[in-house]
Amino acid sequence: MITKNPMQLKAFIKNKAAEKHISAQLVMQNYMLERLLERISLSPYKNNFILKGGFLISAIVGLDTRATMDLDTTIKGFTLTHEAIRKIFTDICTVQIADDVQFEVVGISDIRETDDYPGIRVGLKANYPPISVPLTVDVTTGDMITPREVEYTFSMLFDDRQISILAYNLETVLAEKLETVLSRNIANTRPRDYYDIHILYALRGEECDKETLRQALERTTKKRGSGAILTDYMEILKEIRESDTLRKLWEKYRREYDYAKDISFEDTCNTVQKIMKAIIL
């Protein structure tokens, strides 16, 4: 989107936020992540990046149905080192688009809060003076995608056009979420994992191939060493349902995000159970 000045951009952002019933900060964050994603799609690294995580889920179900502040990707064809990732993102920042936004890499660090896959966190700034928006991109490698990544058509927030980017298929997104919820059991402190499973299945469940999802879950659990959840999921769900801590976390999530206000914790657990019963033979 071409804007005359930062004030006009802020006006567009404010209007979109009102339309979607979400904060202007969230819309600005997603707009700048979109600007970065378009640069990736136009760079020599287009076929090395695979979009996943919250930003992809938001694109699938709608920004007003799932908010996110970061970009999650997996990379193929490169060894995951600080030096390689810094060069890749420095190159991406030089891609010129008529949107008046300039990007800079401000930091590279290891992702330490999860051991699912090795990862690097890239800190960037999106600058449209005086607007400056800090961004985070998480990059992993070795992700188990079943059967393979897909070409995803990503619609722009403001422009009536689309870009093409490689992404996780729906079944792999769901498989990773199911594995996370069940393997971490009551130790999982992220209500959004439950929400993501529920909303994806509610809105896109008919598009989900059950055999592919079963294979994706089996491969994901094998990779993560959590195969026991395939047979123990009913007992695990019983513990989850009875957890006061998880229920309190869910209620807090419902209060914070308007799009979750009509969904109970029991609803999300029922969705997990329904999916598992449908795919576990």
Predicted regions and their residues:
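Structured mid-to-C-terminal alpha-helical surface segments
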Residues: 1-49, 59-67, 71-281
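Catalytic metal-binding/acid-base residues of hydrolase active sites
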Residues: 56
